[in-house]
């Protein structure tokens, strides 16, 4: 029995109790799905639910009285062997081995879809993350959001949301002029201009520009700068996209700030927000009255000299997302952008959206790496591509995904390079590789999945493993709800541990001249179910599931 099947069965029992008048609720008040969880202490049963605590007040009943009535109905669910009322009204449910073991077959048959759900179906989400300036290579400061943003997008999609992963290119404004001037200066051997970009990559970009425009040095600086700006920008964005691909991060949209300006979107945004009564003029400048919606001060949109501010572009960009049909806009920003939360929410409110529903701003803390070498090529920073070459994509992505975004993080390269159980990514990947090796050995021994007898999965380690496999869908749903993919990573580690214990206690393949029995065939189902869940979870984290290690 899967958690979803038990959930539906409890809901049906509750509706029966309502229809007989034992519980005074309207049928519409009964949820179609009742949340079930694994109790922390397995002596308390296989599954637990707090539905009596949730609905008893509405029914005008004591929670334990409510639980007692529901308990009588639950006893009739096929496979349920016991129901106990605990504490103020929790229901602890025990199922027989055959009912519990049936989950293994259900997982294998579900395949890659096991763990997915439709909790967020109908939600149209724009997720903007990384959005590094196209003035240099991706570095460690961008790495955490690349890994986490992609993982969050994956768990949201696994929960039914329609997600667009978007990279906002800051290709307008003064920093692009500084960037172009830095390349120009290097082309003419002038060194780094004041306030310019250092690093060997600037020289490399100059070589790219020279290759595309051999006569660039003969032009005046004024004539050369627009050419250099365009060519160096294209080369740098190509480098960024290549690095993201190497890191396994895919974006659906690369959105240009410059195109906002060129299309007149800034002026349009000011006009729209003025029509809604949120724009005012003062001191020759145009302002947005964001203090009406919790911001600490009103924000300038158009300076007195007629130049739009970055904030104006932020407002136009938000309206673009709204116009493109995204009802939810998620921004993933670094720790130095904490002040952006209120101003972005104020923009949403000025645009007529609910800032508590239509916009979400996630702030991440910094990440560092012990012993990492600074890249002179990039101006004494740690490049993402160097990190991938040094530690491997999987180690970096998994390590970044297994911690909450708001916790500071220091990666330990020595740990991440170890092939031992101390290394979390190795521990999980090895469990998957071991399960695939077990399947190959079983095939050589003549063990197949022609028979499945769930009642044979009665060993304590099998019960433990099944319980964690059964919890996986709820973990994915919770990870999506809270934007916390680390929940998936941590649960995979729990599954890996349970699998290794089961592997040591229960053989899939017969030994020597022993015949192939139904217990071997049934255990192969459990082995393959574990393999499937580990692969599904690693996929959500953007990490490979190796066949061999």
From Swiss-Prot:
Broad EC category: ligase
Q: Which InterPro entries match?
A: aa-tRNA-synth_I_CS, Arg-tRNA-ligase, Arg-tRNA-synth_N, Arg-tRNA-synth_N_sf, ArgRS_core, DALR_anticod-bd, Rossmann-like_a/b/a_fold, tRNAsynth_Ia_anticodon-bd
Q: Where is this motif: 'HIGH' region?
A: 132-142
Q: Which GO terms describe its molecular function?
A: arginine-tRNA ligase activity; ATP binding
GO BP terms? arginyl-tRNA aminoacylation
The reactions it catalyses are: tRNA(Arg) + L-arginine + ATP = L-arginyl-tRNA(Arg) + AMP + diphosphate
* Enzyme Commission identifier(s): 6.1.1.19
Q: Does the keyword Nucleotide-binding apply?
A: yes
Question: Which superkingdom is the protein from?
Answer: Bacteria
The primary site where this protein sits is: cytoplasm
Keywords assigned: Aminoacyl-tRNA synthetase, ATP-binding, Cytoplasm, Ligase, Nucleotide-binding, Protein biosynthesis
Which Pfam families does this chain map to?
A: Arg_tRNA_synt_N, DALR_1, tRNA-synt_1d
SUPFAM superfamilies xrefs = Anticodon-binding domain of a subclass of class I aminoacyl-tRNA synthetases, Arginyl-tRNA synthetase (ArgRS), N-terminal 'additional' domain, Nucleotidylyl transferase
Q: Where in the cell is it found?
A: Cytoplasm
For the keyword Ligase, the answer is yes
Q: Which GO terms describe its cellular component?
A: cytoplasm
Family per record: Belongs to the class-I aminoacyl-tRNA synthetase family.
Record NCBIfam families: argS (TIGR00456)
Q: Please give the PANTHER family that the UniProt record associates with this protein.
A: ARGININE--TRNA LIGASE, CYTOPLASMIC (PTHR11956:SF5), ARGINYL-TRNA SYNTHETASE (PTHR11956)
Quaternary data: Monomer.
Q: Which HAMAP family match?
A: Arg_tRNA_synth (MF_00123)
Q: What is this protein called?
A: Arginine--tRNA ligase
Species of provenance: Paenarthrobacter aurescens (strain TC1)
């Amino acid at each position: 029995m899967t958690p979803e099947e038990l959930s539906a069965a409890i809901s049906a029992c509750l509706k029966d109790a309502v229809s007989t008048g034992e519980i005074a609720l309207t049928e519409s008040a009964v949820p179609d799905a009742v949340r079930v969880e694994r109790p922390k202490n397995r002596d308390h049963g296989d599954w637990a639910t707090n539905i009596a605590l949730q609905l008893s007040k509405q029914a005008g009943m004591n929670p334990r009285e409510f639980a007692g009535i529901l308990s009588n109905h639950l006893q009739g669910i096929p496979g349920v062997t016991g129901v106990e009322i605990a504490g103020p009204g929790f229901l602890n449910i025990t199922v027989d081995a055959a009912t519990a073991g049936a989950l293994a077959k259900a997982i294998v048959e579900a395949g890659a879809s096991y763990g997915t759900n439709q909790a967020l179906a109908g939600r149209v989400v724009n997720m903007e993350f990384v959005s590094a300036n196209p003035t240099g290579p991706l570095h460690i400061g961008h790495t955490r959001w690349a890994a986490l943003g992609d993982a969050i997008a994956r768990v949201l999609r696994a929960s039914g949301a329609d997600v667009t992963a978007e990279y906002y290119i800051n290709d307008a404004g003064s920093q692009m002029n500084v960037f172009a001037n830095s390349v120009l200066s290097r082309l003419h051997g002038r060194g780094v201009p004041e306030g310019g970009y250092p690093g060997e990559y600037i020289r490399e970009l100059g070589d790219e520009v020279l290759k595309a425009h051999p006569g660039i040095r003969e032009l005046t600086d004024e004539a050369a700068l627009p050419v250099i700006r365009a060519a160096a920008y294209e080369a740098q964005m190509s480098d960024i996209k290549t690095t993201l691909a190497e890191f396994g991060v895919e974006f659906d949209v690369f959105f240009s700030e410059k195109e906002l300006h060129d299309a007149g979107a800034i002026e349009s945004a000011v006009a729209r927000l003025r029509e809604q009564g949120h724009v005012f003029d003062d001191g020759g400048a145009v302002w947005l009255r964001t203090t009406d919606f919790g911001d600490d001060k009103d924000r300038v949109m158009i300076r007195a000299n007629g130049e739009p501010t970055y904030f104006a572009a932020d407002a136009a960009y938000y309206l673009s997302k709204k116009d493109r049909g995204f009802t939810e806009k998620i921004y993933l920003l670094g720790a130095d952008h904490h002040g952006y939360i209120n101003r972005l929410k104020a923009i949403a409110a000025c645009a007529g959206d609910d800032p508590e529903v239509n916009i979400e701003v996630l702030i991440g803390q910094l990440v560092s790496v012990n012993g990492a070498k600074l890249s002179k090529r990039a101006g004494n920073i740690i490049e993402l591509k160097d990190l991938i070459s040094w530690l491997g994509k999987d180690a970096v992505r998994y390590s970044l995904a297994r911690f909450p975004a708001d916790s500071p993080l220091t990666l330990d390269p020595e740990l991440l390079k170890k092939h031992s159980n101390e290394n979390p990514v190795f521990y999980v990947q090895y469990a998957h590789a071991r399960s695939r090796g077990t399947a190959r050995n079983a095939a050589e021994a003549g063990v197949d999945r022609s028979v499945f007898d769930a009642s044979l999965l009665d060993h304590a380690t099998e019960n433990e493993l099944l319980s964690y496999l059964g919890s996986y869908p709820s973990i994915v749903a919770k990870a999506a709800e809270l934007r916390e993919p680390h929940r998936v990573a941590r649960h995979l580690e729990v599954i890996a541990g349970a699998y290794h214990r089961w592997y040591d206690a229960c053989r899939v393949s017969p030994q020597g001249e022993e015949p192939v029995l139904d217990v071997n065939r049934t255990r192969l189902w459990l082995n393959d179910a574990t393999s499937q869940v580990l692969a599904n979870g690693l996929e959500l984290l953007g990490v490979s599931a190796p066949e061999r290690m």
